[in-house]
Amino acid sequence: MALIFDLTEDPQQVVQVSAWVGDWHSYVVRLVDEMGSPVDITTGTLGATFTNIATGSAYSFGGGSVTLTKQYSAQGILSVLNPAAYPTSADIRLTVSFTVGSTVRRFGPLEIEVLAP
């Protein structure tokens, strides 16, 4: 059974996980509003951003693109597959965007501490 992380629109509610350099992860997340209710993602466009917390710049996987797969759209559940394995240790912030028309909503962050073995 997969662990499902709730990502909210409140950037103060941070979810933290750890991973090893060389790991290639998929995360299952549920997008929820400020009240904790799931956001229906049936229609609209999803995006993901990986940011190095220390520098504020994009975290580089060295190639590839993130894969976002809607699992249970009405419940706001999707999987986020990294573009590649983590190449370097860092503290990373993953945020997910959901766009319908001209309205962009942002969820997260999921903070990932990538550790060197």
Feature map (PLM): residue ranges:
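Contiguous segments within soluble domain cores/interaction surfaces
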Residues: M1-P117
